[in-house]
Amino acid sequence: MLGAALRRCAVAATTRAGPRGLLHSARTPGPAAAIQSVRCYSHGSQETDEEFDARWVTYFNKPDIDAWELRKGINTLVTYDMVPEPKIIDAALRACRRLNEFASTVRILEAVKDKAGPHKEIYPYVIQELRPTLNELGISTPEELGLDKV
């Protein structure tokens, strides 16, 4: 995708040059000066953290979500270079419970622990925030199941 954008920029730059070189001399600034400041690779707006969280909570709260969409969402969420907010994890756990996907709940919690990496304070914080949901839904953590000792 980036390669295609760079090719478009290169083609656009070569079409602005005529057979005798650039259309404008170097002494007189013209449209070429404005073109140089355009970033050909950046487009679209950045998603804020709140919009990101809302998008994923909405995704997992869909009433007609099926097991495949649930796993696809979890896999996509895990690929991001961040630990999801507890409210996203809460929505995902509730979707797992609606679909009776207990294995996915354990997988989500294991992924959160893995994504926390060397930051040992993140996973306990997430579990603390999710404890009411875990108790309500009857979900055990991997540690409670003894999976951390395997």
From Swiss-Prot:
Q: Please name the CDD domains in this protein's record.
A: Cyt_c_Oxidase_Va
Query: Which BP terms in the Gene Ontology apply to this protein?
Result: mitochondrial electron transport, cytochrome c to oxygen
Q: How is it modified after translation?
A: In response to mitochondrial stress, the precursor protein is ubiquitinated by the SIFI complex in the cytoplasm before mitochondrial import, leading to its degradation. Within the SIFI complex, UBR4 initiates ubiquitin chain that are further elongated or branched by KCMF1.
The record ties this protein, via PANTHER family, to: CYTOCHROME C OXIDASE POLYPEPTIDE (PTHR14200), CYTOCHROME C OXIDASE SUBUNIT 5A, MITOCHONDRIAL (PTHR14200:SF16)
Tell me which Pfam families the record gives. Answer: COX5A
Positions where Phosphothreonine occurs in the chain: T141
- Membership in a protein family: Belongs to the cytochrome c oxidase subunit 5A family.
What are the GO cellular component annotations? mitochondrial inner membrane; respiratory chain complex IV
Subunit structure of this chain's protein: Component of the cytochrome c oxidase (complex IV, CIV), a multisubunit enzyme composed of 14 subunits. The complex is composed of a catalytic core of 3 subunits MT-CO1, MT-CO2 and MT-CO3, encoded in the mitochondrial DNA, and 11 supernumerary subunits COX4I, COX5A, COX5B, COX6A, COX6B, COX6C, COX7A, COX7B, COX7C, COX8 and NDUFA4, which are encoded in the nuclear genome.
Where can this protein be found? Mitochondrion inner membrane
Sorted UniProt keywords = Acetylation, Heme, Iron, Membrane, Metal-binding, Mitochondrion, Mitochondrion inner membrane, Phosphoprotein, Transit peptide, Ubl conjugation
Record pathway: Energy metabolism; oxidative phosphorylation
Native source species: Gorilla gorilla gorilla (Western lowland gorilla)
Q: Signal peptide location in the record?
A: none
Q: Where is the transit peptide?
A: 1-41
Name of the protein described by the UniProt record: Cytochrome c oxidase subunit 5A, mitochondrial
